[in-house]
Amino acid sequence: MKEFKAVFPKALIIFIIFTILCGGIYTIFITGISQLIFPKQANGSIIEVNGKKYGSVLLAQQYNDEKHLWGRIMNIDTNTFVDENGKKLAYSAPSNLSPASKEYEALVQERVDKIKENHPEQDEQAIPVDLVTCSGSGLDPHISVAAAKYQINRIAKNNNMEVKDVENIIDKYTSGKLFGVLGEKTVNVLEVNLAIDGILK
């Protein structure tokens, strides 16, 4: 008991000091630095034009009309979780279906059929895999350059645009490899679609 009484005050003081340092000072310091150096990224990388917010470059938005670039398959569940007021909350995750299952095979085939139906001019071309599969998060905002180029003719036709103009937009919103060597080039779907709509210049 005596040992406890001797150690406890010291432990409590250390606990309080580190709580203030790590939970307070460090948090305030990092938040301040991020707001100073990376204000856009620190606030969610929101795309805002003329005071209107269109979304984040880090989160996918669903596009499935003929005029826009399609992204990866999104798995959004709005039936599982609700808040304290009963409002449905969006939840995203992979399907967890086995790649070897018949159910997954049928699901992918359905997606393949939809892609082919909307891109008849690409009948002989292999469909990029990211157009018929979802990412681990189900909210991936990027697609491969191949997946974007696969859709160019459809987008140009339905927007009365030149193919070259669509290509230029895709090139503008294509990110290179990390440090020039890691990963692959990717295209941000939301930015491309906002540019097609004339919102981003």
UniProtKB/Swiss-Prot annotation:
Organism, scientific name = Clostridium botulinum (strain Alaska E43 / Type E3)
User: Where in the cell does this protein reside?
Assistant: Cell membrane
The record's listing under Pfam families reads: KdpC (PF02669)
Q: Which gene is this protein's source? A: kdpC
UniProt family annotation: Belongs to the KdpC family.
Q: How the protein sits in the membrane?
A: Single-pass membrane protein
Q: How does it assemble?
A: The system is composed of three essential subunits: KdpA, KdpB and KdpC.
What are the top taxonomic ranks of the organism? Answer: Bacteria, Bacillati, Bacillota, Clostridia, Eubacteriales
UniProt key word ATP-binding: yes
Q: What NCBIfam families has UniProt attached to this entry?
A: kdpC, PRK00315.1
Where are the bilayer-spanning segments?
13-33
| GO CC annotations, alphabetized | plasma membrane
Gene Ontology molecular function: ATP binding; P-type potassium transmembrane transporter activity
Keyword tags? ATP-binding, Cell membrane, Ion transport, Membrane, Nucleotide-binding, Potassium, Potassium transport, Transmembrane, Transmembrane helix, Transport
Alphabetical list of PANTHER family matching this protein = POTASSIUM-TRANSPORTING ATPASE C CHAIN, POTASSIUM-TRANSPORTING ATPASE KDPC SUBUNIT
What is the official name of this protein in its record?
Answer: Potassium-transporting ATPase KdpC subunit
Coiled-coil features, chain-numbered ranges = none
Task: State what this protein does.
Answer: Part of the high-affinity ATP-driven potassium transport (or Kdp) system, which catalyzes the hydrolysis of ATP coupled with the electrogenic transport of potassium into the cytoplasm. This subunit acts as a catalytic chaperone that increases the ATP-binding affinity of the ATP-hydrolyzing subunit KdpB by the formation of a transient KdpB/KdpC/ATP ternary complex.
Major subcellular location class:
membrane
